[in-house]
Every structure is written in C-alpha cells, then in structure tokens.
C-alpha cells in the first residue's frame, strides 16, 4: 500500500473565526467560502483571475485579491492575520508565496476537506462518493431534499443549473456534499449516510496501484457513524463487493440497481430497484421501487446512468427521512449541473441545421463511455444524425495510464476531434499527447493540437442533426459556444486556451 490511511483521521473541533483561502475562486473552494460567509466567518482570499465566483463572493462580504502575494495574508487589515489559511490540497504548490508565508508565520494551514468536515460535524452528513457521477448525484440529492422541504446545507463540485450556485447554508439539519477520494480526503469525514456510486481505478498518481485505490473506499465505509447507512450501486462490481464486505462487518447497507444486478448479490439488502427506464424527449421516464414504495418520474437528463444516480439520491434521502413522493417530483424538476451533459445550443438553419452542441466534464474512460451512450440515445430517438466527440485528455499521467481505454470509449462516437493534453498540475511526459489516444481509435478521428483551430475541424466533419460534445475537465469547455458560432456562421470571435 502506497498511502497510509492512518494519516487521514476524522477532523473535529472549532471553526476558525477568520480564514484566508488560496485559490478561492475554484469550484470546491468557492462553495466552502459561501458557507463560511453565511456562518459569519471572516473570509479573505486570492485567485489568479477574476471570475463569476470571485465577484459573487465579494458581494457576500469576502475580500479577495487577484494574484498571489505574501501581503495578501493581511487583506483583513495591516497586521491582522487570519486564524487559518485554507488550500485545495492538489492545486496549490508549496512555492506559493501565501502558503510559504503562512508556514513562516505559524498560521495553521487547513485543507478544503478539513474545513468541510468542520462545517458538517454537527449535521446529518449525507455524502456522495465514487469514481464517477459524484457531482450529478449530489446535485440530484439536493434537488430531491429541497423538494421534500428539508432545506439542506450543501457543497457541490459544480453549479446547479436551476439555482446557479454550488453551495448553500440551509436551515435544516442535513448537509449534502461530495466526498472526494482523489487525495483520500474523504477519510476526514464522518457521514450519517455514505453513497458510493461506483469504484474504478483512478488518481493512480496519488494511490500508486489499483488495490490501494479500492481500499480507500473500504476505509471510508468504516467512517460511517453508528446506526448510519452505506448506499451502494449493485450494478458496479467493486461497489457491490464493498457492500458485501460491509454487511459482514455489521454496517447497514442498502443497494440500488436493476433487478438482474441485485439478484447477483443476494446478501445485499435492497434499497431501490430500477424496473423501467425509457428514453423520451431528450431525457428518460423512470419506474422504480424505493423501499416498498413505487415511484415514477421523468428526468431531463439522458442516460441510464442518470436514472441510477436518481435512485441513489432517493435512497440516500429516504435514510434521512425525506418523503419519497416529493423527492420524485423534485427529481422530475431537476434541470442538471453545468458541465454535465450541459446543453449549449442548436443550429437553426444552414448546412448544419438541427445539430446540437453539449459540454461534459467527463475525464475518465468510463465517464466518456456513459456520456457518449447518452448522446447515442439522442440521435437514436431522433432517427438521424451522428455523434461527434471533441475530447481533451486531462492529466498526462491519466492519458498514459488509460490511453487504450480512452480510445475504446471514444470509438463509441461516429467521429472525433482529439485535442492535446490539458496538463493542469502536471508536467508533460515524453510521448504523451492527444495523438497517443487518436492513433488507437477505430473511428475517423482528427488530432488537432492547436486549440483555436478545433471549431474549424468540427465544421469540416459535422452534418445536419449531429450531436456534438466537448468532453474533458480542462479548457475544452470554452469551445462549446465557439462551435455553436462556427456552425452558425458567426465565427468572428475566438478564444484562447
């Protein structure tokens, strides 16, 4: 084992009265900042650029500087240092001047996950974990509980489309959040209910091997409070195996999935059964049993995986006392999460009439397969068009480790455009680029390493009524609207990666 899980213990204690957050505009950090501000904590922070998140936090009372500088530690006033500095574990290098200054001044440094644990410690924590689907399932859970009148606090890894926010301090006693496994930080939490959607090797740059990655979820299950529940998807073999081990250890387990999958695991107590799932109007009609109650609702989102995520939300909500009928109505009104099969536009006239453009955060082969499967449903339902994947690999290590799997997943599309790797926190690796995947694919593919040329490459291969997806966790999201403009004939503006 390359990671010592004993180094990750549940975090409890008092919230600091003031914090300085480095990288405050990030998806996870900005959500924590919103809740801290709502609780009356003094918040300062810094980020590399202005953003909607930064503007919104300033409006709530945060003092935020653009650019990183040691003097930012005194944004609250000259000589007034924060009680703690908060960082997102993977994103902030040790050479950051504010982080280095905090160490020199003996200011405690907390990870984002530490602060989230402190925020949740007096609530019923309903946490969503798993390799894929965390943000969608967390957002669905929030929507379901809100419809049931519980007003939960929540912290989500993306912006909920309807609410336009990623976090909220609620009046209820339930706190819904994602439990991120990428750096084992989920082990700092003590959930009342833990949902695990699936388990598949990822983040091997941190864990080192598959077995250590699997083991972090077993350790997470051990963090569940006495009398709490572990909710797992029986359709995922590793999640189901974890559920079976948890049953043997005396943990309360509830499984969800289709009838066939549940029948393969007879020792797993059943929380929900998916009886029917029918694509309709770009979404799906769902028929299921949750506990002993039959429910029917329609989702706005395509893909069977989204129906399973909805069941996870209902089982988790049932564990904290939410009304099933009201949750089902809430799921029917759920409009999605930005960057999760996020609709950007369609072409109304011209040579590409009827083409639809979506954007998705998928950055693992299984996620790519799921999103392309959902896109296939749309063209099948329409009876015309093809699926075009515009994919930007994320991280050099992940591209190297999963090149074959990415090639197979992307080959579920009809055509593809491959960008170069979005390295994020990593340095380039020799021989690792978008072509590494493109050369292994079995469908027509264009490798385009020049970011601003991608919309033109899409135009060369697009046809009427195609479903076109920009896919990846990096800057590829900026191209969705550019492709809409390119295919509409309004391509005067360009973006830079």
Where are these regions (language model features)?
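BRCT (BRCA1 C-terminal) domain core and associated BRCT-interaction motifs
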Residues: 68-84
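ATP-dependent carboxylate-amine ligase
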Residues: 1-65, 81-83, 139, 218, ...
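Glycine/charged-rich beta-loop-alpha catalytic/anionic-binding loops adjacent to active sites
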Residues: 122-124, 290-299, 346-357
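Phosphate-binding loop of NTP-binding sites
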Residues: 10, 35-38, 58, 73-77, ...
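N-terminal Rossmann-like NAD(P) cofactor-binding module of classical short-chain dehydrogenase/reductase
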Residues: 86, 195, 469
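Acidic-glycine-rich active-site phosphate/pyrophosphate-binding loop
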Residues: 275-295
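Conserved RecA-like helicase motor-core motifs
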Residues: 44-46, 149-156, 254-258, 446
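Conserved SAM/SAH-binding loop
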Residues: 67-71, 115, 451
């Amino acid at each position: 084992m390359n990671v010592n899980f004993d180094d990750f213990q549940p975090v409890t204690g008092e919230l600091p009265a003031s914090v300085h957050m480095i990288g405050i505009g990030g998806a996870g950090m900005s959500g924590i900042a919103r809740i801290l501000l709502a609780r009356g904590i003094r918040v300062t922070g810094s980020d590399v650029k202005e953003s909607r998140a930064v503007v919104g936090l300033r409006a709530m009372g945060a003092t935020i500087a653009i650019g990183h500088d040691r003097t930012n530690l005194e944004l609250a006033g000259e000589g007034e240092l924060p009680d703690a500095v908060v960082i997102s574990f993977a994103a902030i290098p040790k050479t950051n001047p504010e982080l280095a200054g905090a160490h020199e001044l003996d200011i405690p440094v907390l990870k984002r996950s530490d602060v989230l644990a402190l925020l949740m410690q007096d609530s019923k924590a309903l946490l969503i974990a798993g390799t894929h689907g965390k943000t969608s399932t967390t957002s669905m859970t929030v929507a379901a509980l809100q419809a049931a009148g519980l007003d939960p606090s929540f912290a989500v890894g993306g912006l909920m489309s309807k609410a336009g926010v990623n976090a909220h301090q609620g009046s209820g006693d339930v706190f819904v959040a994602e439990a991120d496994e990428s750096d084992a930080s989920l082990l700092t939490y003590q959930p009342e209910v833990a949902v695990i959607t699936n388990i598949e090797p990822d983040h091997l740059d941190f864990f080192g091997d598959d077995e250590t990655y699997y083991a972090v979820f077993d350790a997470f299950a051990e963090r569940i409070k006495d009398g709490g529940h572990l909710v797992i998807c029986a359709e995922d073999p590793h999640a189901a195996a974890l559920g079976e081990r948890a049953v043997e250890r005396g943990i309360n387990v509830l499984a969800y999935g289709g009838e066939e999958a549940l029948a393969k695991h007879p020792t797993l107590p059943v929380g929900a059964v998916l009886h029917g799932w029918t694509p309709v109007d770009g979404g799906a009609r769902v028929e299921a049993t949750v506990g002993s109650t039959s429910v029917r609702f329609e989702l706005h989102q395509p893909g069977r995986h989204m129906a399973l995520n909805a069941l996870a939300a209902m089982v988790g909500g049932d564990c904290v006392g939410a009304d099933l009928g009201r949750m089902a109505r809430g799921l029917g009104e759920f409009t999605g999460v930005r960057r999760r099969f996020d609709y950007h536009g369609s072409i109304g006239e011209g040579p590409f009439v009827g083409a639809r453009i979506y954007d998705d955060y998928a950055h693992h082969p299984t996620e790519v397969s799921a999103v392309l499967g959902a896109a296939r449903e749309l063209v099948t339902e329409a009876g015309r068009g093809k699926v075009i994947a515009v994919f930007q690999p994320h991280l050099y290590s992940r591209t190297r480790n999963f090149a074959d799997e990415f090639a197979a997943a992307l080959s579920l599309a009809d055509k593809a455009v491959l960008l170069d790797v979005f390295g994020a926190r990593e340095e380039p690796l020799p021989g690792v680029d978008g072509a590494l995947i493109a050369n292994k694919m079995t469908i027509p593919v264009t490798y385009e390493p020049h970011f601003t040329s991608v919309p033109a490459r899409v135009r060369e291969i697009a046809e009427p009524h195609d479903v076109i997806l920009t896919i990846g966790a990096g800057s590829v999201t900026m191209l969705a609207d550019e492709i809409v403009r390119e295919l509409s004939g309004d391509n005067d503006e360009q973006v830079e990666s």
